[in-house]
Amino acid sequence: ETYIPEDESLDFVFTSPPYVGWEAYGDEPEQSFNKFKEQDEWRNGFLLKTIKNAYIGLKPGKRAAFNVANVKSYKTFEEDTHQCMVEAGFRSIDVWWLSLSTQQGARQVATLEGDESEKKQSNNYIGKFERPDLPGRKYKPIFIGVK
């Protein structure tokens, strides 16, 4: 949230911001999970500020991609990221879907017809941006915005 690029100096932004309280990149007091103890504080003080800084740096007509996923400790991370993107001034133009692999060696389930299907994930981290055409599969949305 402290890095502010030069105005309109970037051709593309791709980021996967740290998930509040879920990913710790160090013990320094300036780390976002140390600075912002409450989810709303983190959303407004880190996530929104970071996305606004990306908007400042992006050239007009250029795109940004925000790769996130809901987690148990932050069930609205996807929705909050998308909302912050729009609040910062981005026009939401697309959602790309990143398919998450299943654990290697995970059991496969065979049907009577002999077809194998992936073991269903017991945790649903997808929120309102779940792919309706592939229910039960785990995907992360990558929100695409244009300045």
Where in this protein do the model-derived segments appear?
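Conserved Class I SAM-dependent methyltransferase catalytic core
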Residues: D40-S101
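Short conserved AdoMet
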Residues: P5, K59-P60, K147
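Short, low-complexity, polar/charged sequence segments that are solvent-exposed and flexible
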Residues: T15, S32-N34, Q83-E87, L112-G114
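Mobile active-site "lid"/loop adjacent to the S-adenosyl-L-methionine
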Residues: Y3, S9-T50, K72
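Short coil/turn segments at beta-strand junctions that form active-site/ligand-binding loops
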Residues: E8-S9, K62
